Design a protein with these regions (language model features):
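Short Fe-S-cluster ligation motifs
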Residues: 308-330
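A structural signal for isolated positions on well-ordered beta-strands in alpha/beta enzyme cores
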Residues: 34, 57, 126, 153-155, ...
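Conserved AdoMet/S-adenosylmethionine-binding subsite of the radical SAM
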Residues: 330-462
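A structural motif
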Residues: 30, 87, 122-123, 197, ...
Length: 462
């Protein structure tokens, strides 16, 4: 099930077939539709639509095209509309310097006033931005980020990576519409690659911006599936991954839908199955959300208790249908080495491929060289190097005090031993960490240690 986070089904383009369009959306797997107001009248119509369909929600706000008509009465009406229980956001509001249907000074003035009203009412905002990057960022930075609260959604994102990163830093989600499917939208697709899963949405902006392959026709919520499929392709995940992550994001922003339930033991991303054995770890990496938000691609990896080997094995269906089975959660799998070995043995006997994701502390944790014990059980190992020297490693990965001032060297020793017993060995780092020379890390992996190297972008978990 997918969510269309931005549509305008109240518009006259749907006057003749609105019910059938909404029915087609449901039949195509659309779980919720957020119908977005553009002025007071359309906001009122959005509410009326939400009252007829339990899966349709509404927003209220005035689009930058229409702010030239705003007065005190309009603000009073908006305030009243926001008392309705199905109005879950304020918008769409913002700046549009492409068409300039309203004078820019009025756009800026009413954007600020609507932001202030949204904050007073405690509502997230739906942001419209077109060709107004500098003023947009200048205005938003006066109000966001909020302490402990998300800001809202940059809808139908069309900006560059810098705008996306600065919007993310202020607490906004980024939503992609039909243009991400357009033939010449390579820059936009590059941005779609780097949005963290927990800040991602997809939308239609119906009736506008119909995605390929239906471009040129009137848009409708069912087409959000095309956009979601393209975003999944761009990000190297499945459409199910996009559906799951955006559904959780919708719940976390608006409280609509379902929370991700804790206790996940096995979880599928792309065509790999991951096994979550523990939340304990010998590191407390500065970039890790193990304690604050143990969620990966919409799965909640918080464990009520550590699963037994039997429970782990029983959580797996058919090992042969996956590209690989990966021991990887937010904790360090080698803290439960016996479980790793017992389950890996069964996976191999059933014809599966096994990969171990580890911080490379396994020999120190278990006080022996564990690599010979993994021979024949583990086909591939990914080891988190994360730094180009011991001092940087201790600052970024924050190992247990007893492991500092030397664990980095032990990780290199672990890698050298892994090469003797495991067919595929890879070193990984998380990018954008202060004080880390990423080029030097690649040299250490390739030239010094003679293994493959992979850099994972900060905040791109899973």
């Amino acid at each position: 099930m997918i969510i269309d986070t931005h549509a305008h089904l109240d518009m006259e383009e749907y006057a003749g077939d609105r019910e059938s369009v909404i029915r087609a959306a449901r039949e195509s797997g659309v779980e919720y539709i957020l119908n977005v107001g553009c002025d007071v009248d359309s906001s009122r119509r959005s509410i009326e639509l939400s009252e007829r369909y339990d899966f349709v929600y509404a927003t209220a706000g005035v689009h930058p095209h229409d702010v030239k008509a705003m007065d005190d009465t309009a603000y009073a009406e908006l305030r009243e509309l926001h008392t309705h229980p199905k109005v879950i956001a304020f918008g769409e509001i913002g700046l549009d310097y492409f068409r300039d249907h309203s004078p820019r000074d009025l756009q800026r003035r009413h954007f600020k006033k609507q932001l202030e009203l949204a904050l007073e009412l405690g509502k997230p905002v739906i942001i419209h931005n077109r060709d107004a990057k500098d003023d947009m960022l200048s205005i938003l930075s006066g109000y966001y980020p909020l302490q402990g609260k998300p800001a809202g959604i940059f809808h139908c994102f069309s900006g560059d990576q810098d705008l996306a990163e600065r919007a993310l830093a202020m607490g906004f989600y980024i939503s992609f519409a039909g243009p991400v499917t357009f033939k010449n939208a390579n820059g936009l697709r590059d941005v779609a690659k780097i949005i963290p899963p927990d800040r991602l949405f997809v939308e239609t902006d119906s009736p506008y911006l119909t995605p390929a392959p239906n471009r040129g026709k009137r848009n409708e919520p069912a087409n959000v599936n095309h956009t979601a499929r393209k975003v999944a392709e761009i990000r190297g995940v499945t459409i199910e991954d996009v559906e799951r992550t955006t559904a959780l994001n919708f719940f976390e922003l608006f409280g609509i839908g379902r929370a991700a339930q804790p206790g996940t033991i096995s979880y599928r991303i792309r065509n790999s199955l991951y096994l979550n054995l523990t939340q304990r770890c010998t590191n407390a990496c500065v970039f890790c959300t193990r304690v604050t938000r143990p969620v990966v691609q919409g799965y909640n990896l918080k464990l009520r208790r550590e699963p037994s080997a039997r429970e782990v094995w029983e959580s797996i269906d058919d090992v042969t249908k996956y590209d690989e089975i990966v021991f990887c959660g937010f904790g360090e799998p080698t803290l439960r080495l016996d479980v790793v070995k017992e389950v890996a043995k069964k996976i191999k006997a059933a014809g599966g491929k096994v990969r171990l994701n580890t911080n490379g502390h396994g020999n120190v944790i278990n006080k022996r060289n564990i690599l010979p014990e993994l021979a024949g059980l583990v086909d591939a190992v990914s080891i988190s190097l994360n730094a180009d020297n011991s001092e940087s490693y201790d600052k970024i990965c924050v190992p247990w005090p007893s492991l500092r001032n030397g664990i980095y060297g032990k990780i290199k020793e672990f890698i050298e031993e892994a090469k003797k017993y495991i067919p595929e060995v890879q070193a990984t780092i998380v990018t954008h960490q202060t004080g880390v020379d990423e080029g030097r890390c690649e040299d250490i992996a390739g030239r010094e240690l003679g293994i493959d190297y992979r850099a994972r972008r900060f905040n791109m978990v899973g």
